[in-house]
Design a protein with these regions (language model features):
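Active-site Tyr-X1-5-Lys
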Residues: 140-169
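NAD(P)H-binding glycine-rich loop region in Rossmannoid oxidoreductase-like domains
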Residues: 54-99, 103, 107
Length: 274
């Protein structure tokens, strides 16, 4: 169905505003006429005119003061990364989320956009292909990143439940890549191409940070209420990922031998075509 007409411009706070996605979100929101304040622990030059960047630690800052007069919060600084393994990391990040939600409720924030992950669905053999937003959230219990994101969703849902004046958008993106961090993509591709099982080789999906930023901005514009998968239409086979990564599969070795390309040199092709 068509999306509803955009709402008027509002005051928006974006956490994690200096990251690859955060900078894009801030710039696009400002271009749409919103008053944008970015919050991050790292200092940064504003990505566009009309964006104010404040250096704050969400774990200790006065969030009620920072969110006063704000209509929408886009929470991108939302927790652990897929590479984190420490047992306390997720708890610390969830404490920050709890503080943010409490402050948002106290000052009357009306719309919350949170970045979750498609990994909250879990890698289960009975998953349908493709997965839709109607699929149950059941992360693999040993995968800290996915468990954390599922808990984040639960906390955000509790914030919105029972309050008809509160709108919650939950973004569930596929693995997101950007030109600024090609090394992270290399690790993901390498790990995926090394997986084998009786069910066959894994399928991969990759999302450009531009597209995730556009999804967040669209959610703000129409005040989208509910979960939203953010992913490409199709997927990439293990053979193609090996071609792009240049390792973890004999095809990659053959390509390197026959073409002279260094392992990993074709990762740019993936980014350029997303």
């Amino acid at each position: 169905p068509p999306l509803p007409a955009p709402y008027p411009a509002v005051r928006v706070v974006v956490t994690g505003s200096t990251g690859a996605v955060g900078r894009r979100v801030c710039a696009r929101l400002a271009a749409d006429g919103h008053e944008v304040v970015g919050l991050d622990r790292r200092s940064s030059v504003p990505p566009a005119p009309g964006v104010e960047i404040r250096v704050v630690d969400l774990a200790v800052a006065d969030l009620r003061d920072l969110l006063s007069g704000v209509d929408t919060v886009v929470h991108l600084a939302s927790g652990v990364t897929a590479g984190d393994v420490g047992g306390n990391t997720g708890h610390d990040r969830l404490a920050v989320v709890e503080r943010l939600l409490a402050a948002a409720g106290d000052v009357g924030v009306g719309h919350l956009v949170v970045r979750s992950s498609a990994m909250v669905y879990g890698a289960w053999p009975d998953n349908p292909v493709p997965l839709t937003e109607d699929a149950p959230v059941r992360p693999c219990p040993d995968f800290l990143f996915a468990v954390h994101r599922a808990r984040l969703e639960e906390m955000a849902a509790a914030w919105a439940d029972g309050h008809p004046d509160r709108v919650l958008t939950v973004l569930r993106p596929a693995v997101t890549v950007a030109e600024e961090r090609p090394g992270g993509l290399a690790s993901v591709v390498g790990a995926a191409t090394s997986i084998r099982s009786d069910e066959g080789e894994p399928l991969g999906q990759f999302l450009h940070s531009d597209d995730l930023a556009d999804a967040a901005v669209c959610a703000v514009a129409v005040r989208y209420d509910g979960p939203l998968n953010v992913a490409p239409d199709g997927w990439i086979s293990a053979v193609v990922m090996a071609d792009l990564g240049g390792y973890g599969h004999r095809v990659g070795s053959l390509l390197a031998a026959e073409t002279g390309r260094e392992p990993g040199s074709d990762l740019r092709r993936l980014i350029d075509h997303l």
